[in-house]
Amino acid sequence: DGGPCDVGVESTIVDCSEEGAPPVILRPGGVTAEQIEAVLGHPVRRTPDGPSRAPGMLPAHYAPHAQVLVVEDIDAALASAAARARAGERTGLLTPRAVTVPEGVTALVAGDTPEAYAAALYDRLREADRLGLDLLVVVPPPAEGVGVAVRDRLARAAAGSAR
């Protein structure tokens, strides 16, 4: 653990090796597709074809020990967390901003902007491990800017933690 950092998610990996073809984002990261396009002056492909060619793309790469359940709607996330806590599971709820959580649910806050969420993401996943949670219900940030990279990491954490 290198401690707190400003960006949080790892670097963006871009493949520029195919002459005449647009660059391809192999792994979204702290530098967004929009930022790359602004520098290059033309679009980049956001989805690579074929098998993964970048590190950090395996589903389990980001998975904490707790099962991760990504839920888009805060009310649905609260209901899911409450039900699982009532069933006896040690449950956490990771949200962009502070919310009042049901009894038996541990609140974890990532940050109310995609950038703040990205900077806090890995610390919150490790905190879920330190707390010994069985389940971490996650409300992701919007799918814009670095939020795309955060959602990618959350999807991988959820896939890698599926029980």
Q: Each predicted region: which residue ranges?
A:
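Active-site-adjacent structural elements in enzyme catalytic cores
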Residues: 2-163
